[in-house]
Every structure is written in structure tokens, then in C-alpha cells.
Amino acid sequence: MQRLIPIAFSSSVKGFVRRHYLLLERGNNPETSLSRSFSGASHHHHYRERLRNELHCIKFDDAFSLFCEMLQSRPIPSIVDFTRVLTVIAKMNKFDIVIYLYHKMENLGISHDLYSFTILIHCFCRCSRLSLALALLGKMMKLGFRPSIVTLGSLLNGFCQGNRFQEAVSLVDSMDGFGFVPNVVIYNTVINGLCKNRDLNNALEVFYCMEKKGIRADAVTYNTLISGLSNSGRWTDAARLLRDMVKRKIDPNVIFFTALIDTFVKEGNLLEARNLYKEMIRRSVVPNVFTYNSLINGFCIHGCLGDAKYMFDLMVSKGCFPDVVTYNTLITGFCKSKRVEDGMKLFCEMTYQGLVGDAFTYNTLIHGYCQAGKLNVAQKVFNRMVDCGVSPDIVTYNILLDCLCNNGKIEKALVMVEDLQKSEMDVDIITYNIIIQGLCRTDKLKEAWCLFRSLTRKGVKPDAIAYITMISGLCRKGLQREADKLCRRMKEDGFMPSERIYDETLRDHYTSLSAELIKAAHE
């Protein structure tokens, strides 16, 4: 009988199995309970029927029940039938469960075949248990099984996911010994892993190695390398590969162009991004919504709203319909440039087109109107948000609270915070900082101090801003001793103000102890 290596199973796997078997014992699975009363032949027929009719749409619990039913069948089903069920469970990403079930099979003396070993190795790799996968590979080879290209591919993916690239490259080099010639997919797996790990020199070395062996790189190879090089600012190398790609008549597709445009945008290289867009059009590659969103986002980030709006209009004229991300990007750009009315026009257009704004959309507009000093309009946008069924989040309330406090409406802000505390929403330190600052600004130091002292009781830990705000408030009132105590407590909690915060907040009010602590923090 084949014996697999001993495995320690996680508590979650043990818990699931325990609960499942309890249900079976209590008879909560009528299908399984009914099957127990059948004869062996009837039971055999029942699971075979389920294998034939249910596997294509089976749910996880049902697949697990089917496996248990098969274990009880006599004669015991073949390894092929067991593997069919376990393949389905593995596709549900229940890798620990698959490993557990294989050991249940082993305990019944069911011998594994190449395919079942391969699935088990795949599951070990996906669970980041590479040492067990390698031990199992050795075990199966001792039993006379020769690994397939799928087996080796699973190991290769496992090495790359575990950042064990030397072993990945060694595995590729040794594939000839197993009778397999690594193809472009195998090399792409290694190159992709190296690029994600920013090990670009080794990625290029693997690329040149595959070229020497006569394996032609494809669009995926070039896309991975060029994106990785561009993300690391190696524009010369990226451009050289791009020229090489074009020379070989490997046509870049929309995904390739979009990824590269997005990289240039993130690097702030808008000229190259725009040129790539023109190259797409020249090559008759049709840009998609992601392409336009990347370009519009880049123009908005760098304050080129005219270019962003032009690209938006061009997008529409070419029959590519903007999505919520497109509108949110433009609305944010307009609001940051203090053109909130233009942002609102876009919001109305978006609604007219049948798109529903999300919390981000409304938060952007509310913030824009608050910054413009139009609290009443911000309140109307908030009301519309609620009426449209979009739930305000803590960011929404923080924006409104900040606006109320900045406009001297501290009483309204306090009522809103009280309502928030009664709701199920988690009130964060940012919320309390806004209120504490508002109270200090309106000479309500006593109320601010009470709120500050209650934070720990509310399960919220004060941060540096909370401390600085209170120390500044105490200093302005001439309460030097209390300020010194709080400064000492701030240091004990591991917070020290930056030089900028000190300059802006404490310089005019510092006490001797405050000055000493701050000086020590920056030596």
C-alpha cells in the first residue's frame, strides 16, 4: 500500500470535517442517510449517477458529501472516480480539504495514480507547502511514476509564488531530463515571477536563455518584461524590447498597450503615454475603457484638465462608453481644481447615462462643496446620496463634520457625532480629532478635554494629532502644567510631533518640558 508523507492539518480543516461528520451522524443529510440503507450495488449505482449528472454544477458541501458516500461504497470506487471529485474540490480552491481527503483514501488502501499525485502536488504548492510537494514528487518517482509536464508546471508555479526563483530556474533546466522541452508558457511563468519580484536582470537572463534554445518569445513574454522594466524606470531597456517585438511582427494587443500606458502615467511620463495611444490608433488597435481611464487619470493627477476632458470626449466619440471610474476620475479632477460645478455637471450627465454614483462619487462632490464654503449644497448632495440608496461611510461623515467645525457649527457637529455613536458605524480617531479641534477652536477646552479623556474608554487610541491638538489648546489657555503632563504621556505612548507640526502648532506656546521633549526627538 502506498503511504504518503504525514501531514499536520489546520484547525479550520479539522473543524470543518468535525462539523460535517456531526451532521451526517445526526441524519441532517437525508441523501447520505438514505443511501446507507441501500444494498452495495444500489449504493454503487447511486454515486455513479451523481458523478455523471452533478459534477458540472456541484457545490462544495455536496461534493464533500459525495466523497464520503464513495468512501462507504462497496466495492470501493476506482482512483479515477475519486480523482474526478477531488479535481472539482481543488477548482474551488479548497486545497487543504483535498489534501485531507487524499489521506482518507490512503487509509482505505486506495492506490494513487499519476493524475491524483499531480493534483496533490498542485494543492501542496497552492498552500505554500513546497517541502511536502517535493517530498511527494520523490515518493511518486520511487513508486515508478514519471512526472508529467502538468506536475512540473505545478511545482514551477509553487516555486515562483514562494519567491524561490533559483529552484524555479533549476527545475526548468532539468525538464530535459524528464523528457520535456520547456515551452514559452513555462518560461513566461518564471519571467513573470521574477518581474513581480523586481528581479529584472535575472528575468532578462531567462529571456535570453530561452531565445538561445530556440524558444520564441510571445506577446505575453514581451508584455511582462516591458511592463516590469518600465515600472522600474528602465526606459531604454523597455524601448529596446519594444522595437525587438515590432521587428519580429509580434503585434501588441490592447492589454499590452493599456498596461504600458498605465505604467507611463504612473511615472508621470504623459508624453510617452500619449504617443503610445497614437501608436495604438495607427496600428488599428482599439483602445478600451481601461486605456482611456488610465490616460484621463494621468491628465487629472497632473492638473491637465483640458486634456482629460478632451480624452473623455474623444472616448465617447469613438463609441467607448465611460464607466463609473471614468466619471469619478474626472469629477475628482474638477473638484480638486475648485471647479466643483463642472464636477456636478458631469455627475448629472453620469446619472442621465444610467450610471449610479457610488460613495466615492458623492464624497468627492460633498468635499468639493465644503471646500467652496457651500455647506448647504453639500448637505443637499448628502441627502440625495441617502435618497438614492447609497450608504454614507465614515469618510462622508468626516467631511461633513470638518466642514461644520470650520464654519463654527460645532453644536451641529456634536449632534452628528452623537448619532454616529448610536449607530453601528465604527467612529475612528479622525472623527474625534475633527471634533476635538473644533471644540478647541471655539474655546470649549473643557469639552475637548472630556472627549479626549474618553477616547480610550470608547476603544479608540489617541494619535499624535489628538495629543498635539490638546497640548496646543492647553498652552493657549496658559495651563502649562497640564500641557507638560500630556506631553510626557504622549512620549510614553510613542508619539512625538514632527518638526512641521511643532512649527505650526506649538512654537508659540511651548513649555520647558515640551521644548525639551521635542528637541530630544529630533536630535
Swiss-Prot record:
Keywords: Repeat
A Pfam short name: PPR_2
InterPro entries: Pentatricopeptide_rpt, PPR-containing_protein, TPR-like_helical_dom_sf
The UniProt record lists the keyword Repeat: yes
Family: Belongs to the PPR family. P subfamily.
Organism encoding this protein: Arabidopsis thaliana (Mouse-ear cress)
Spans of repeat PPR: 43-77, 78-112, 113-147, 148-182, 183-217, 218-252, 253-287, 288-322, 323-357, 358-392, 393-427, 428-462, 463-497
Protein known as: Pentatricopeptide repeat-containing protein At1g64580
PANTHER family referenced in this protein's UniProt entry, alphabetically: MEMBRANE-ASSOCIATED SALT-INDUCIBLE PROTEIN-LIKE, OS03G0201400 PROTEIN
UniProt superkingdom: Eukaryota
Record flagged with keyword Repeat: yes
